[in-house]
């Protein structure tokens, strides 16, 4: 129901403003796909008021109007880390003169041990005929084309007697994203108390599979495309968010994503305290899952960083293994094109001077 977005609030045309008291983070793929299987080995963040997520998203969903909204979610709502929320979002977002026409189908699922106490393998399978969510290889939800249920309008939550979300997801390609932030709706995520900060989401590895009906691995319909173990940061594969949006109490900051000891780390901190100084949790079971896999497309050792608009900065350290690596995106060639956020709400309802929204990534 409460959507992530891909926007930056600007104080002056092409200059980013970080006006909120907290910093979150988002990591997303440069590539998008039409169908596939997506897995990530993660220990999620938790704490009342937080959202720790993995999701698929069509990059232009926020435009609204006649641009379809296409999204599939796994979200840990910090008030209850023993459950996760699955969701499909389709329909059309609001735009000038048009209402919010998005449709959601949220469901809750148990996780044991709790998502912030242990690593789990989270997965999403997206095909023309179904969408499935998995935890540690077990299917916990499968939504089949023509059999969708529990659909509601996002604006007002009115029940829909019919929805064709699986078919509608096929209108656009999606990229894979991870983010950590805090929503202002306490009823959804829990009451906020910043004494919990900092909190972290740890990503051991990510696997992306192509949809290849009848030609996949081990007789499946999915063929492994690449595995990233985050021993280094692949700027040709990943970019970092640098934006905020209505209802979010944090600024999404590129300064709050790190790699350390073969782990990607997404942080939620107080503003000005963007850092990771703790110990990386161990995940021997997850390490074993990829220890025998080919390194052909594993991490960035074979990547070409100059092909990406992101730059990779490493703290000076006598030990590459122990170095924490903050990764920053360059804000280049920004184009200001509107005054609404990804949810379609105006970010500047009082028409203050020099307040615009950047729709570039």
Where are the regions that the model predicts?
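Generic secretory/membrane-interface signal
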Residues: 2-3, 11, 34, 39, ...
């Amino acid at each position: 129901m409460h959507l992530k977005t891909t926007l930056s609030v600007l104080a002056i045309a092409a200059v980013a403003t970080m006006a909120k008291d907290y910093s979150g983070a988002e990591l997303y793929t440069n590539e998008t796909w039409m169908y596939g299987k997506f897995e990530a080995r993660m220990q999620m963040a938790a704490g009342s008021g937080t959202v720790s997520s993995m999701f698929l998203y069509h990059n232009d969903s926020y435009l609204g109007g006649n641009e379809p909204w296409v999204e599939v979610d796994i979200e840990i709502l910090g008030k209850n880390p023993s459950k996760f929320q699955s969701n499909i979002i389709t329909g059309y977002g609001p735009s000038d003169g048009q209402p919010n026409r998005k449709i959601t189908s949220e469901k809750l699922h148990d996780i044991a041990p709790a998502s912030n106490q242990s690593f789990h393998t989270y997965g999403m399978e997206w095909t023309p005929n179904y969408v499935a969510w998995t935890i540690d290889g077990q299917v916990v939800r499968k939504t089949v084309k023509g059999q969708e249920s529990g659909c509601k309008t996002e604006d007002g939550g009115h029940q829909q007697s019919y929805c064709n979300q699986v078919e509608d997801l096929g209108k656009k390609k999606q990229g894979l994203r991870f983010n950590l932030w805090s929503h202002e709706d306490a009823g959804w995520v829990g009451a906020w108390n910043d004494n919990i900060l900092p909190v972290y989401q740890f990503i051991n590895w990510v696997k992306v599979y192509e949809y290849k009906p009848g030609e996949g691995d081990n007789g499946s319909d999915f063929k492994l495309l690449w595995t990233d173990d985050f021993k280094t940061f692949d700027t040709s594969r990943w970019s970092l968010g640098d934006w905020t949006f209505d209802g979010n109490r944090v600024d999404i900051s590129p300064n709050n994503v790190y790699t350390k000891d073969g782990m990607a780390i997404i942080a939620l901190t107080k503003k000005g305290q963007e850092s990771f100084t703790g110990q990386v949790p161990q995940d021997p079971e997850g390490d074993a899952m990829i220890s025998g896999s080919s390194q052909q497309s594993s991490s960035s050792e074979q990547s070409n960083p100059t092909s990406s608009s992101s730059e990779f900065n490493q703290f000076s350290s006598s030990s590459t293994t122990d170095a924490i690596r903050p990764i920053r995106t360059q804000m280049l060639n920004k184009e200001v094109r509107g005054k609404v956020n990804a949810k379609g709400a105006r970010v500047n309802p009082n028409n203050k001077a020099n307040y615009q929204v950047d729709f570039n990534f």
